[in-house]
Amino acid sequence: MTNDPYHDRESITELLKQYNNLRSGHGSIFFEEEAFEKIIDYFDDQEDISKALEAAETAIEYFPYSASLLIRKADLLLATRKYREALEILEKAELFDGTDINLYILKTDAYLAMDMQDKAVELLELAVGHFEGEEKIELLFELADVYDDYEEFDKVFDCLKVILEADPNNEEALYKICFWTDFTGRNEESIKLHLKIIDHNPYNELAWFNLAAAYQGLKLYEKAIDAYQYALVIDEKFDYAYRNIGDAYIRLRKYKEAIEALEKVLELSKPEEVIYEAIGHCYDRMKNFAQARFHYRKASHLNPDDSKLLYKVACTYFNEGLWTSAVKQLESALKIHRQQHEYNLLMGECKLKLNEYKDAVQYLSNAVRIRPKNLSGWEALIRCLFVAGYYTEARQQALAALSHTNNKTLFLYYLSAVLFQMNKTKEALLYLEKALSTSPKHLRKFIQLHPPILQNPQVVDIIAQYKRASK
């Protein structure tokens, strides 16, 4: 038998007419409880809460011992934020029928609205013990939501675990526990739980996926990939499995395999910038800068306001020695985020490569100002000033770098190199000795800064002395 919408409308119209007659005292027709419920539902659907509440009160006059009508009234009172009144009605309803699950759900809503979390938790924990099957599971979900709202996240995981132990194929719980496993870090428990679920039903692709995600959380990437593959055998269009396989392969530095998995994601789902960016990252690591750039650009087209993608394109040009092309990308990135340390640093390096020293100094000074404790900014600025022949300024910046970075040895070497160029040999040798005695490993950068320094016999002698002493 099919539903007839026209007949339904005609029926409710007639019912409303009879109800209005009853309210005005002109009708003598007997109303069944179900008829009142239809009228309440009608006004509720029309979002006329006051009339719905009026209908509920009228219904209760005729059926004062109906738990379902009292619960309906309490629900409407909650909608009007009359929480205490709603609780009083629910207490009364419980006397007539304490087995209606809506009693506990609505009481919980009232307690939470009144910021009485402890009462809500106590009620639900008690109620869970009185119900079985689907109703128990519904209450456990409700309890999990309460724990979530009040940031008791381990207890959220516990609720979902209990649900899955009772109903291993519950999709909502399977989806949620994947997130909460990652959030709480309870990967070992998740592995045990999902192995049991798979033992019960080996064709549950969500259980395989969650098992894989838990392995991934423990950095057991090969095991994770195997489990994702099982999920894909069951559902070959499971795009999130391919996505996570791609991530696992990236962690294993198997970039070619990662690209294959991520390209499958693009086949199965709507294009996303994060996928194109990840593919670009893989090509970047494989030093295929043209392909990396191609995918970073695709990501950028999907999110033009993400300056980081423009920066990554610039890095590919920089790695190929295409300084001018890198500068163009960085100019665009800096228009979006001018105060990014990395953008200013790379722009300074590009300008240095192009022998545009004044611009280079400006950008590198910005980088240092933005992150004064970062070594790379100071290192690049002093190196730039040295290459440009601005030795007085280089000396000042080397001293400033030592002050800001807790006397990092690298800047003792750089200060020594600068002093040699300023013909302050005695002072330069003192700083070189101090640097060598503190950390010989940065000697390479000292020599890289100015290779002809090895033609100075005093420098060669000091280095030789420290090499002999370290043997």
Residue ranges and their predicted role:
Residues E34, S68, N102, K136-E138, ...:
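Start-of-helix register in tetratricopeptide repeats
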Residues Y62, L95-D97, H130-E132, A166, ...:
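Structural marker of alpha-solenoid helical repeat scaffolds
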Residues A59, K92-A93, A127, V162-I163, ...:
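Canonical positions in the second alpha-helix
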